Amino acid sequence: MSATLTGSGTALGFSCSSKISKRVSSSPSTRCSIKMSVSVDEKKKSFTLQKSEEAFNAAKNLMPGGVNSPVRAFKSVGGQPVLIDSVKGSKMWDIDGNEYIDYVGSWGPAIIGHADDEVLAALAETMKKGTSFGAPCLLENVLAEMVISAVPSIEMVRFVNSGTEACMGVLRLARAFTNKEKFIKFEGCYHGHANAFLVKAGSGVATLGLPDSPGVPKAATSDTLTAPYNDIEAVAKLFEAHKGEISAVILEPVVGNSGFITPTPEFINGLRQLTKDNGALLIFDEVMTGFRLAYGGAQEYFGITPDLTTLGKIIGGGLPVGAYGGRRDIMEMVAPAGPMYQAGTLSGNPLAMTAGIHTLKRLKQPGTYEYLDKITKELTNGILEAGKKTGHPMCGGYISGMFGFFFAEGPVYNFADAKKSDTEKFGKFFRGMLEEGVYFAPSQFEAGFTSLAHTSEDIQFTISAAERVLGRI
């Protein structure tokens, strides 16, 4: 089931060719369970961010804005950014000693929980042999075979170091293979910070209130065409207006960088047909959705096979990683097999490969995605019901271990709809939940994530906290 974004207080689904079972199973036996160590009253009395404030003020003299990625500065939600000291399971602890149930999960990679014992042990063994070789290693073969066997579209894969790198490489490859330069992306979809993609790019720029980024030459985006998400007619018009010039259509199959937005069946099926009819490639950016919506990603979930796919986050188990892959005839254009050049000093490094291998092994265990679906449904519906009880218009949805909610009536089908959300109210909600010991993404325009480490106790605590906070707003 795919949950649409409605204002009804429930997550309603539309039918699709999903391979996900809706059966509810018990949680995998290996998931981490960490008890809340203090009561709600004790937590609120002890909550302070003094050390975080001091460290952040010092950081602002050392790094632009005090951070190394803009959303971490809390610009769109206000308040004091927290500096994290340690993580384990579903929890994080800041340098002031505050404990949080975490629904960011390092922005997606921590699907089996933070600092998993098996992953840490495997990394320790790998590090005894070295941290980087700058040469091929057997671990690359192992992870490549796992990715190829899991993701329907991938017959060959190239590992890189980030989602941005993956999207840069896949766009260059699409242009090389088709010998066309224009491509279509969607408003609110984020594909990294390469120049060609920084047009109506979703959360990365929405957080700062900017439509794009200074420093991006007009020439770099002259071949970037944009359309509203879920608007297949707009895409058809672009193909008509630029006949024979469009190399590819790239999208987040479920948007995570405008908040959480799902595709309509007409839209996602229509894209597959339009690209085939016009000699263009369909690219799924599955940096967020890969191995999260299903073991085979969004393409398995929806039953739509693109020509090329980008991956990241989960396949590195929390270490820097990215990948792009697809049909063999396309991938054989990548150097050194073919003329399309792309390289990387740390690509395929043994640490990221190790963490990825052990993360995917865990995800392949029976009951994994049924458990994620169960707890995420409970969480999302609980938060929406809390909004209903306290008189706050909200809408939201979920698929497997990915979810989102907006302070808006809904429904939300695209970035224009998402921007109608009450961001001031979201900021109040975010800050209130932080004091309650719950860490959501510090932006209305970001999806949230659950993990195998989240327990029913975590979910119930979060729902109760949401009702308390919403009751005070």
Curated annotation (Swiss-Prot):
Main location (coarse class): plastid
Transit peptide: 1-37
Cited InterPro entries: 4pyrrol_synth_GluAld_NH2Trfase, Aminotrans_3, Aminotrans_3_PPA_site, PyrdxlP-dep_Trfase, PyrdxlP-dep_Trfase_major, PyrdxlP-dep_Trfase_small
Pfam families documented for this protein: Aminotran_3
Paired cysteines (S-S): none
UniProt keyword terms in alphabetical order: Chlorophyll biosynthesis, Chloroplast, Isomerase, Plastid, Porphyrin biosynthesis, Pyridoxal phosphate, Transit peptide
Reported cofactor(s): pyridoxal 5'-phosphate
Domain of life of the organism encoding this protein: Eukaryota
Modified residues (N6-(pyridoxal phosphate)lysine): K313
Pathway: Porphyrin-containing compound metabolism; protoporphyrin-IX biosynthesis; 5-aminolevulinate from L-glutamyl-tRNA(Glu): step 2/2; Porphyrin-containing compound metabolism; chlorophyll biosynthesis
Similarity remark: Belongs to the class-III pyridoxal-phosphate-dependent aminotransferase family. HemL subfamily.
PANTHER family registered for this protein in UniProt: GLUTAMATE-1-SEMIALDEHYDE 2,1-AMINOMUTASE, GLUTAMATE-1-SEMIALDEHYDE 2,1-AMINOMUTASE 1, CHLOROPLASTIC-RELATED
Subunit structure of this chain's protein: Homodimer.
HAMAP family referenced in this protein's UniProt entry, alphabetically: HemL_aminotrans_3
Cross-referenced NCBIfam families: hemL, PRK00062.1
Protein name: Glutamate-1-semialdehyde 2,1-aminomutase, chloroplastic
